[in-house]
Amino acid sequence: MLSLLFTNLITCLATSTTGEYIYNETEARILSSLSAGAYSATPTACINRILPGDWLLHLRIEIACDEGSNRCAAYIARSDKQKRFIIVFRGTKTKKQLLYEVKKSLGKKGEFYGAGRANLYFSNALSKLWPEIEPVLYDRTFKDYSLTLTGHSLGGALASLAALKIALNGFRSSDDLKVVTFGQPRVGDFDLARSYDELVPNSFRVVHGNDIVPHLPPCDKNSSFVVGGRKACSIDPKNVAFHHATEVWYPDGMEPGDKYILCKGPPVGEDMNCSNKLPFEWSKKFQYIRDHIYYFGYKAR
């Protein structure tokens, strides 16, 4: 049933009649479950449960990805019938890794192939995983296979940067490249966000309620753009932390039928009518953490 459903989703719901890319919640739920599976050393069971049929584990990667020998991981699921890959990146695994991420995120950003500046922890981690991913993209056997990239938290950041790198290198066209992430932090500066929006338009960042991680690292604020007492992120190209589009915000819950908002208002990528309008208070820190860990009713890690 799930396999047939997913087939229908990818063949019929890629774009609307106006040519605009569509967010589909059912697909997002499937990808969220696959993202949770990235925390397992054996994602085959997850693939078999979520994507029955001819879907299989094509490749799993795990490698030390920072100076503290913390490890990053990803896996690739493949369907030959659908001619499709799903590349799933794992999120932060340990508190030690989180500390390295935070330290690196507070430092300078690095140039990302001329598209803007990226968070060095994320770009360096991707560079460690890339030698295993790139041969799949080069393989002529799979040249007609479309790509969906996904991940939770750090995994979402890696998925976004990987998609941008794939587009910049011409491995896939925009129509054959899709990204859906969950609780993703900001991955780079304003210029990187705009480059991403141009090259990877079929992209959705799902945000659960008060999840704090999508608001990190903090952006520079625009004092002249204030909504409900909250300052908007500045669109100055010097802004070192800015989200790409499109946020999908679930303000109340993530059960079937719960409300979500497609956040396309100004500033693009940092819509002030969505999660950016929320005040963050230390007294609610446990709620922020819970909203980050749980997506669509299930623990994401």
Spans of features found by a protein language model:
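Short, glycine/serine-rich, charged loops/turns that create anion-binding
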Residues: 92-93, 154, 186
